[in-house]
């Protein structure tokens, strides 16, 4: 029996990789399980440069993006900007996920939301991580912000 899934993604406007990488992963999954079919839908938050001052302004657009994707009746929604979430402070991934899920419900198309930051923190907990090595495409202050966020939540 065929199962159709609509995958929604909130992505920074300057990101040029996620909209090719995620569909490729979904297609690879479908090749292993042909009964699972996916459509991929994205909405963009405006951001030209990954700088702390732009991250909060960009995150403010995530509510609009969640509404747009809920118009498409997506089954799940991912927020694909780890540093934007982490720049907002300790535990913000939970706040964001809850708020965006509420926006989809208010639009009559409730969809669970996961952020890349939340997925990373959850995965590190599940794995019982004792050490972390981080390679990041950010300037040193933003990389330190990411490390501080992770360390504050997983207690290594």
What feature does the model see in each segment?
Residues 2-28:
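N-terminal basic/disordered segments at the start of proteins
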Residues 11-17, 81-93, 120, 136-142:
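Gly/Ser/Thr-rich loops at beta-strand to alpha-helix junctions
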Residues 34-60:
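N-terminal beta-loop-helix "entrance" segment that forms/cooperates
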Residues 54-72:
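Glycine-rich, highly charged phosphate/nucleotide-binding loops
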Residues 76, 83-106:
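Glycine/small-residue-rich loop that forms an oxyanion/phosphate-binding "nest" at active or ligand-binding sites
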Residues 96-150:
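Hydrophobic, well-structured mid-protein blocks that either form specific transmembrane helices
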Residues 154-156:
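Conserved small/polar residues in nucleotide/adenosyl-binding loops
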């Amino acid at each position: 029996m065929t199962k159709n899934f609509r995958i929604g993604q909130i992505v920074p406007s300057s990101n040029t990789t996620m909209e090719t990488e995620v569909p490729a992963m979904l297609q690879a999954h479908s090749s292993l399980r042909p009964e699972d079919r996916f459509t991929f839908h994205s909405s963009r938050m405006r951001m030209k440069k990954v700088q702390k001052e732009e991250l909060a302004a960009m995150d403010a657009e995530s509510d609009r993006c969640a509404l747009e994707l809920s118009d498409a009746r997506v089954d799940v929604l991912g927020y694909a900007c780890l540093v934007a979430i982490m720049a907002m402070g300790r535990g913000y991934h939970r706040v964001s996920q809850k708020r965006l899920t509420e926006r989809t419900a208010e639009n009559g198309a409730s969809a669970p939301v996961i952020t890349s930051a939340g997925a990373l923190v959850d995965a590190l907990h599940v794995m019982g991580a004792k050490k972390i090595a981080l390679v990041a495409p950010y300037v040193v202050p933003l990389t330190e912000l990411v490390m501080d966020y992770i360390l504050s939540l997983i207690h290594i």
